[in-house]
Amino acid sequence: MAMQSVRRSRAVRRSTSLLAVVVSVMVVAGLHAAAAAASPASDEADAQKNKALVLSGPMTTLKAKLQGKTNVDFGPNCDTTTGRVKIPSVYAPPCVQPFTGKNGGATSQGVTGDEIKIVVYTGDPQKDPLLAGQIRAAGASLDIEPIRQTWQGYVDIYNKMFEKYGRKISVEFYLASGPGSDTAAAKADAIAIAEKKPFTVLGGPAQSTTVFADELAHRGVLCLGTCALAMPQKLSDRNKPYLFTEGPSPEEAATLTAEFIGKQAGPGKAQYAGNDATKNKNRVYGIVHYDTPDGQYKGLFDTLKTQLKKNKITPKADQSFFLDLSRAQENARTIVTKMKDAGVTTVIYTGDPLTPGAVTKEATAQDYHPEWIIGPTVLADTSIFARTFDQEQWSHAFGVALVPGRTPQDLNATYNLYQWFHGTPPPNNTYGVINPSVLLLATGVQMAGPKLTPQTFRDGLYRSPPSGGDPINPQLSYGKHGAWPFVDNYGSDDAGMLWWDPSAVGEDEVHQVGNGLYRYADGAKRYTLGKFPAKGQGGLFDTASSVTIFDQLPPADAQPNYPPPAAGG
């Protein structure tokens, strides 16, 4: 078992947006973090399940199998052994036959015979004091030019390596007009971008993506990846087929959380609590959950309650809160008082990565020592934020790991992909935020075929088989592939199990060495719905079988060794 590594990663210039420092450390930490060999057999089985969809699309390796064709030339960018594009990533899509002929020209807004126009939104630290302070605290530069260079660098990779049917992806950058928390600015920016008539938008205002994405979709513009972070299911449903993100929906994450709690922390003694008195009590559950003034995340809370009930758990208390840093201490006092007065032994937390800092410190002030269960969160399951929580309290925290097991930078496939293609490292440390969104776009374009529209883009994502599912690669799929009992417009399908170890030493997600790391149970194994282990299994709080940071890739996750393109792009 590879254990934690404290070696320093290669130096990288740190220029960033709010997405990189605050919201999408989740992606930096591991989503699309490394590569593993694809499984042709599982791809072919999935193609049989989605036969009509695969047959209706371009000639792919999977379509050729279904039609019994063995003499299709898929070109030099295809690994004929795996049937996927020859890039060092488990998320490479199936190969398609190189295109010749007419592509239909202007098939959609932002699409011409030779171009796919996209807009990349970047935050402006000069207009956002909170963002600027966070960037400086992370040791980063306020210069946004390197982040634009990195966006363009990944676009260049997929322009060369993926099929775009005679077109190329063309990037226009848009600088935010206000801070990421300004919903009025977010809406105005979405309108201004929509008036440019792009095919899609990547990136968005971190705290206002629901407003931003909703406005873009309403105006017929696709919003992909970090454009639509933590998007509630109802927002996606009313905006089909314009919103696709990389992570699970909040409701999907809640469903996975409820299964985890039912199997690993169901009714019984609160054995992981912070003092003996609480450990000897039967579990009493409470939920602390983030929402917005207009109730965007009520669906998450309702789903969590419903799914907990299916697992024989009925919370005794709940407390919602808004993310208002000026009232953090007041909110914390309200939350802790309510949980303590209700006799809650087991607090289920779902929300942002800042609130637990105030809440855990207030819990200590009130001599309240419950179990803390980490549910659907944005970044509370990352070490960079968990180190800011009360360490004694958080040493009794455990839950679902939406992010996968971590690797140091020199084993990170997103980092190495850039180096492989360009011959140089990414210009800054936001590569983990950037690449997944560009890959999502390029995959949908390749799998859509020459007539590119939002509808064929959706079908392209749906016909691509699931990828990942190992300790350092979340399973990623869109459509209906068996992970969920419905057609799914969200990305990752699985989760691991973790707990906080305040004594572990190593790098956080922005490569700062310090005390405190999450331990991933059972070698960071991940589980889809219905597959979480029963109590006493799965290695929760078993240090010997856990991992903090892989110092070498598990054998099954070794990166494919392809020669780089001759021209380096």
Which residues does each PLM region occupy?
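N-terminal secretory signal peptides that target proteins for export/translocation
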Residues: 1-14
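C-terminal region of N-terminal signal peptides and the immediate post-cleavage residues
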Residues: 26-49
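N-terminal extracellular/periplasmic Venus flytrap/periplasmic-binding protein-like
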Residues: 43-189
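Solvent-exposed, acidic/polar segments of extracytosolic/periplasmic ligand-binding ectodomains
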Residues: 50-105, 109, 326, 466-569
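Extracytoplasmic ligand/sensor domains, especially the bilobed periplasmic-binding protein
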Residues: 73, 198-318, 371-399
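Beta-alpha junction/loop-to-helix N-cap segments that form part of ligand/metal-binding clefts
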Residues: 146-152, 159-238, 246, 322-329, ...
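Extracellular/periplasmic ligand-binding modules, especially the Venus flytrap/periplasmic-binding
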Residues: 352-358, 403-467
